Amino acid sequence: MRIAILGRPNVGKSSLFNRLCRRSLAIVNSQEGTTRDRLYGEIRAWDSIIHVIDTGGVDQESTDRFQKQIHQQALAAAEEASVLLLVVDIRCGITKQDEELAKRLLPLKKPLILVMNKADSQQDLQRIHEFYGLGISDMIATSASHDKHIDLLLERIRQIAQIPVPSVEEQDVVQEDELPSEEAAISLHAFADETLFENESLSQEEASFLEELVAQTATPAPVDRPLKVALIGHPNVGKSSIINALLKEERCITDNSPGTTRDNIDVAYTHNNKEYVFIDTAGLRKTKSIKNSVEWMSSSRTEKAISRTDICLLVIDATQQLSYQDKRILSMIARYKKPHVILVNKWDLMFGVRMEHYVQDLRKMDPYIGQAHILCISAKQRRNLLQIFSAIDDIYTIATTKLSTSLVNKVLASAMQRHHPQVINGKRLRIYYAIHKTTTPFTFLLFINSNSLLTKPYELYLKNTLKAAFNLYRVPFDLEYKAKPARKSN
């Protein structure tokens, strides 16, 4: 079931959306027009998921150049949803915009709840009777900012959705056999023939240390959910246009003015039976360019989108040089260790430029670009868009592939036989064995005799060996180490 939240500007729609979804997904600000696109969230309750759509404020008398598109997005959400919430400001009484919206929504013959928001006091509640004139019989007074009567609204939504209330026995009870079990401890003996130095026996102390560490190491199973893909870039590079072109519909408002997108917009899409969630983000600006709190929150939300996504699509403008913002975003993606693809948009404007030469020059402009997958596309002409799905799938397959312990150890054993670690104070680095610890982020864990024997050049050598062996050129990964505790002196 889908619920659409509609209303004129600044009546608290985004605050209500955040309360229902229990997350700050929509930017909340007293400035009118803060929300422009359709923003999607979820109510997770009663063992069910209800999808919620937040829309921009509809004001047909506004001179805002985005108002026509906001109006279209709101009406599209009303058509898409099965339940409608018309939000009004109880303190203002009925306005002309409220009346116009009610007239548009009532003929849709869908369950319609009038949410009289901002009922912060008992005095506000005395104005409920003023709204009978809208002709909507289902009415609930709320205060989203103070979390008042949201439970009543949720209960009404549950009734409309005909979701049964779980029995007391079913609520908040976790059966013992349903508790997540830790993965079985990896037996040291199972890998006795896979240690990197097969001909060297372990001392009893080393064996005990190794067995204890292995038993504590578990790798979580990959989550079965849609793949999250965030489109990142500085303002006006065409992020929203790319999503609209991929989906073949106007899901995100576009304009030539930088900063059109303010919220992070999650758009679900299925391609070749695979589920994706595209996250359209606000453009990341230079700090000096951020003029108000709404733009600051948008930039902050861009970083949050990077942190929660599976893959980043960095969108750059083919007609412009790689900017400071682009490099800042690249470093941010690297800091969060996210696989990424670089989309060079507006390629239709690059007359007489050879693509391979452009890509070669681009790789030299920033070390974080490295061997990243680069696609030259045109959202306007829908050129090379399907290659985006192929690039996403390829890189995600590599990034989520669980490597066998046997294979990882054989690769490292071969590397150490080719180039032995240097001797330091009469001792040499010893790797007992290694495992592929996690896929998100991609991490190897090496059990070694001492951190002091691992030099930076040799660590880089090991990392490059793993990168080449497992084709990790486009997947950021880390090496972690567990060293044997130093012997206690008597």
Curated annotation (Swiss-Prot):
Belongs to the TRAFAC class TrmE-Era-EngA-EngB-Septin-like GTPase superfamily. EngA (Der) GTPase family. PANTHER family: GTPASE DER (PTHR43834:SF6). GTP 2 binds at residues 233-240, 280-284, 345-348. Residues 1-165, 227-400 form the EngA-type G domain. One of its GO terms (biological process) is ribosome biogenesis. It comes from the Bacteria. GO terms for molecular function: GTP binding; ribosome binding. It comes from Chlamydia trachomatis serovar L2 (strain ATCC VR-902B / DSM 19102 / 434/Bu). InterPro entries: G_ENGA, GTP-bd, GTPase_Der, KH_dom-like, KH_dom-like_a/b, P-loop_NTPase, Small_GTP-bd. The gene is der. Pfam families: KH_dom-like, MMR_HSR1. GTP 1 binds at residues 7-14, 54-58, 117-120. This is GTPase Der. Keywords: GTP-binding, Nucleotide-binding, Repeat, Ribosome biogenesis. Residues 401-485 form the KH-like domain. Associates with the 50S ribosomal subunit. NCBIfam families: GTPase_EngA, small_GTP. GTPase that plays an essential role in the late steps of ribosome biogenesis. CDD domains: EngA1 (cd01894), EngA2 (cd01895).
